[in-house]
Amino acid sequence: MTIGYRDAAGDPLFPWLMEIKNSMEDLYAGKNSGYDLDKLLFDCISTYKKDSRYRNDLRFLKIWFLYLEGREDFERVYREIEETEICKGHSLLYEWYAIFLEVKGLWRRANSVYQTGLSRKAEPFDRLKEAHSLFLQRISKRTKASSLEKVGDDAQATDLETGFVNPWETSTVNGLIHKIKPQLVKYDGYHVSNKVFPGKANLSSLQNYSRNKIIEIGGRKYQMKGCAGQGGFAQVFKAFIDSNPDEVVALKVQKPPFPWEFHMYRQLDCRIPDSQRSSFGLAQRVHVYSDYSILVCDYLSHGTLQDVINSYVVVGKSMEEVLCMYYTIEMLNMLETLHSVGIIHGDFKPDNLLIRYPPENLTETGFHEKTGSWSKKGLCLVDWGRGIDLSLFPRTTEFTGDCRTSGFRCVEMKEDKPWKFQVDTYGLCVIVHMMLHNVYMEIEKKQSLDGGYINMPRTSFKRYWKVDLWKELFTKLLNRETCEDDTETLRNLRKSMEEYICSDPKLMKKLNELLAKQRISLCSS
């Protein structure tokens, strides 16, 4: 590291710079020990660390780093640099320390330093952003192969401080499926064949078949009742088992075969408490052939949250705030439960949230605890093809893939930063915005009280809303500086909204009326 100089007049740091320069030259020539240089650096720092003239002086920052590089307690030294706010607004503070950490193999910590600098808008900002992007590219290349070798291997997981992995990349998914294969074949309802689908029906053209067509899968006969959904690789059909209208299922037909989603469903069976299990979809069985896989799931007939939102859009109205808040509580509770057991959905959007209705009328009792009829009410999260099982990765793994779903790319994806739980919580924010405003969410940087910037929706809140609750939700979920567990944040947001609704009997009464009205409207359409 080289040190620059300027005129010594009125600059008491200048003689120290000259002495440090001479000491470094002597050290390289073998004329003194490193101890002499360390003492000189320490004395210089102690003399001027509280001198405001040098708080934003890059020469002084370089002296700090010369001292830091020779210390085993470098983290303590860096904390002191932060506490004394030396060059806090300059990108070189973060770039130099991140490079130092990267060389030591402390990649996760290095990434955190870059993120801190970016969140503070350190200048030159574009230089720091480019340095961070290049860092992610380097780490991605280094960890791509090694992270897959560590999947499911707890003994080796600690060897790698962190990995940056695309969880949806074909090679990643195939590696995971290979690792869990011994477990996969033991799952109840898992049926595999190395042959092509033996049925007479062409599964690729099922949508063209007439209603009531009978196809046989795994010894059972299914009466096709129509297409319920279609994606890039899969089609979902409504069907009756043995032509019995009381046994309705959803058949998800996918090519090429994709057993991963069934693994996610069985992990939900294992990890989610029985009292909440019906909120996350149920898979009965899967048939995996060499050309197709067919996933058999429970079928819910009451539409999706997207249908509810659309019912307001078509009449030019926005959803009532108390109903928005109710569905927000549902989603917060879902993600709190999922993330606490190490599961990420990865495709959290309104058309993957099915509506659930109880068989009997709702009562106010049990709203907080989701007991009685409330336990059968709410939402059901389905489509687990992009689900992430965190137990299969080292604990500190962070993700770099892009979901490429318009309107649902989280801030980290847009800014080329690693993410974890943000992929779900950003989806939640988009859905809440759609319920409140009838449009997708657009993000803008707004100045915060501490002089920095935070991500917030561009569209303003209406004055008569409970603005403090909505502002808190978007502020906390759109501005997470780390990829650490977010369950406490989700829980606190949920409880605040629950307490607000329960504080006024009129709100609870109105909510019941709106849910009853919604049920009549959707079921009759």
From Swiss-Prot:
* Localization in the cell: Nucleus; Chromosome, Centromere, Kinetochore
**What is the regulatory mechanism acting on its activity?**
Autophosphorylated when the cells enters mitosis.
Domain Protein kinase stretches: 222-520
Going by the record, the broad EC class of this enzyme is transferase
Q: Does the keyword Aminoacyl-tRNA synthetase apply?
A: no
**What catalytic activity does the UniProt entry give for this protein?**
L-seryl-[protein] + ATP = O-phospho-L-seryl-[protein] + ADP + H(+); L-threonyl-[protein] + ATP = O-phospho-L-threonyl-[protein] + ADP + H(+)
Q: What does this protein do?
A: Serine/threonine-protein kinase that performs 2 crucial functions during mitosis: it is essential for spindle-assembly checkpoint signaling and for correct chromosome alignment. Has a key role in the assembly of checkpoint proteins at the kinetochore. Acts as a substrate for anaphase-promoting complex or cyclosome (APC/C). Necessary for ensuring proper chromosome segregation. Can regulate chromosome segregation in a kinetochore-independent manner.
Q: Which GO terms describe its biological process?
A: cell division; chromosome segregation; mitotic spindle assembly checkpoint signaling
**Active site residues per record:** D347 (proton acceptor)
Kindly provide the name given to this protein in its UniProt entry: Mitotic checkpoint serine/threonine-protein kinase BUB1
Domain notes per entry: BUB1 N-terminal domain directs kinetochore localization and binding to BUB3.
Chief location of this protein? nucleus
Instruction: Name the gene.
Output: BUB1
What EC number(s) would the UniProt record show?
A: 2.7.11.1
Q: How is it modified after translation?
A: Ubiquitinated and degraded during mitotic exit. Upon spindle-assembly checkpoint activation it is hyperphosphorylated and its kinase activity toward CDC20 is stimulated.
Query: One Pfam family from the UniProt entry?
Result: Pkinase
Gene3D superfamilies recorded for this chain?
A: 1.25.40.430, Transferase(Phosphotransferase) domain 1
